[in-house]
């Protein structure tokens, strides 16, 4: 099973992709995670990606396409995978389709997690991270001590691309470049719209029901 998760920044794609990965035993491939790992390690890819991500812009196709094409050919992807954060444009979707065609495979379903803009801004601008990997939110998941991680006791920080002004720019970029991909998968007859406004557990149930109805 090969799935693509679509939706605006903050729609919960990463959370749901992780659950799908666990439930169906297929790898979760997140271009965002790949970029952040490289930024943290100070690699050349990380330096290139950071220039764009800090401004709320998409990393250029030539960088992203190569990473994904290489990743999906790895052994753990033989039974399928779930893509989160890619493809983001019609051009990327066409590159993915061609790469899969060469492997004798296709995208089975594209899940579009739909969340209103105001909820996206609230979700992202209130999110705080810890370098140990834990995530908190000033409204939905407050730490026991303000500004301190419950797990490791270190100071929390806000990602540059989660600051309110950058979130708004990310949404503009999404509508300019990424939203048209919804029509791309709709035209192929494999788009499934998911209400992303409930709590994550409820969204997971909606996705499970949709995949079951689609025969997965």
Model segments located where?
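Glycine-rich phosphate-binding loop of ATP-dependent small-molecule kinases
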Residues: 1-216
């Amino acid at each position: 099973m090969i799935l693509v998760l679509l939706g605006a920044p903050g729609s919960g794609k990463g959370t749901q992709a992780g659950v799908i990965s666990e439930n169906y035993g297929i790898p979760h491939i997140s271009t965002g995670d790949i970029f952040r790992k490289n930024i943290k390690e100070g690699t050349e890819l990380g330096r290139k990606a950071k220039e764009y991500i800090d401004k709320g812009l998409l990393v250029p196709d030539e960088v992203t396409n190569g990473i994904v094409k290489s990743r999906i050919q790895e052994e753990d992807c033989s039974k399928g995978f779930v893509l989160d954060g890619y493809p983001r444009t019609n051009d990327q979707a066409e590159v993915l389709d061609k790469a899969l065609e060469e492997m004798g495979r296709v995208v089975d379903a594209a899940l579009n997690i739909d969340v209103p803009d105001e909820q996206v801004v609230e979700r992202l601008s209130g999110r705080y991270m810890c370098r140990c990997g834990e995530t908190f939110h000033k409204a939905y998941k407050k730490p026991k001590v303000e500004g301190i991680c419950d797990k490791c006791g270190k100071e929390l920080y806000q990602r540059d691309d989660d600051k309110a002004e950058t979130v708004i720019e990310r949404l503009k970029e999404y509508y300019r470049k990424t939203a048209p991909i919804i029509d791309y998968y709709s035209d192929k007859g494999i788009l499934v719209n998911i209400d992303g406004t409930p709590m994550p557990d409820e969204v997971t149930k909606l996705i499970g029901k949709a995949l079951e109805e689609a025969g997965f």
